[in-house]
Every structure is written in C-alpha cells, then in structure tokens.
Amino acid sequence: IAGGVLYVADISVVRTFDAKTLAPKADVVIPGATFLNDVAAGPDGKIYVSDSGLKQGEKDFEPTGTDAVYVIEKGKAKPVAKSTELGKPNGLLVDGKTLYVATFGSGELYTLDAKGKKTDAAKLGKGALDGIVLLGDGSLLVSSWGGSEVLRGKAKAPFASVVTGVKAPADIGYDKKRGRLLVPRFLEDKVEVFEVK
C-alpha cells in the first residue's frame, strides 16, 4: 500500500485498488512478464515489482528467462534490471534508497542500485528465498523454502535461523507494534504467527 493505493502482482499485470474502498483502479500491464511476484513501495512513491521468470510446466515451474525487477512511476513500468543473472528475483524491500532483492532461484540476497547493478550479493541458508522484511534494529528477516526457515541478519553480515520447521514459508510480514512475524505456509493454506523482537 502506498499513497492510499493497494498494489497487487498478478502474473503479467500489477492491479491497483483504492486501499479504503477496494474499488479497482488502473492496471499496469508489463509486457513480456511471466511471473510477477512481490511488490514493494519506496518512500518516494515509486513502486517496485519482481518478475521471477517462471511459468507453470507439466509437473513444476519452469524458467522463462524473464527475470526482472521493474519500477512503476505514474502508472508506467520500466525495468530497473532484467537478466537471468538476477537469479529468479522474488522478495523485495525498499529501505530508504536501498532496494533489497531475495531470490528464489539462486538463493541470494542482494541490492540493486538505481542503474540496476547487483551489489552486496550473499547466499543465504539453503536458498529458495521468498519474503523479506526490515526490523527496527536494522536487521532483515528472510524466508527460505530451501531451509523451511526464516533467517535473521544484517546486510553484509552472517544470517541465522530464528524460525525453523515452517514448510514453504512465503512472503512474510512483520507487525512492528506487537513484535510479531507472520509466516504464510504456502502449501498448507495457513499463516503462523511468531514473536520476533
């Protein structure tokens, strides 16, 4: 949610809704996108969306080569970065001027600069990363399907498990007021809540 608008990634379109009434607003079509995944808002009003570069195959997801991170400004999307080197970008987080990317394919956490250059890349845990949130102390929480866990750490520093045994932990959320981590268990259609301060 940014500026009273709810943004929702839907395969190749970012749908927008009035955050109060939920009335549909304009759609932002992203030509060539195959698996729009996470959406994050920057403090400057820019909206970022990841394309994990996947499609449903016969038995599992298959790569499409459309791996990208887009920025949406004034209802138009343009790529910040577009390359299979992005490693199937999934979770996004904007902290000030820093754009963090958690990848499902390469299991990396990295930042993208304004020109789309990948920096500070680090492999985390057992990979298959999904959601990412920022805590008040500046540390990050990142969910990992590969490790069935949520990891905590600071950029350029080691990460450690803070929640384990959560199969398919998807795009996590954090309630700063109550110190609660919300972990959707994608394959089980449920959300678990953990205290993390």
Give the location of each predicted region.
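A short loop-to-beta-strand structural motif that recurs across blades of beta-propeller domains
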Residues: 13-15, 67-70, 108-110, 149-151, ...
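Short loop/turn segments that connect beta-strands within beta-propeller blades
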Residues: 18-23, 72-76, 112-117, 153-157, ...
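A short beta-strand motif characteristic of beta-propeller blades
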Residues: 23-29, 76-83, 116-123, 157-163
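Anionic-ligand binding region
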Residues: 69, 90-93, 100-112, 116-121
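Short, conserved, GDST-rich strand-edge loop motifs in beta-rich repeat architectures
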Residues: 49-65
